């Protein structure tokens, strides 16, 4: 998920 919403 660290690719488009939660960095």
Swiss-Prot record:
<dbReference type="GO" id="GO:0007218">
    <property type="term" value="P:neuropeptide signaling pathway"/>
</dbReference>
<keyword id="KW-0964">Secreted</keyword>
<protein>
    <recommendedName>
        <fullName>Cardio-excitatory FMRFamide homolog DF2</fullName>
    </recommendedName>
</protein>
<comment type="function">
    <text>Increases the rate and amplitude of spontaneous contractions of semi-isolated hearts. Increases the amplitude of excitatory postsynaptic potentials in abdominal extensor muscle.</text>
</comment>
<comment type="similarity">
    <text>Belongs to the FARP (FMRFamide related peptide) family.</text>
</comment>
<feature type="modified residue" description="Phenylalanine amide">
    <location>
        <position position="7"/>
    </location>
</feature>
<keyword id="KW-0027">Amidation</keyword>
<keyword id="KW-0527">Neuropeptide</keyword>
<dbReference type="GO" id="GO:0005576">
    <property type="term" value="C:extracellular region"/>
</dbReference>
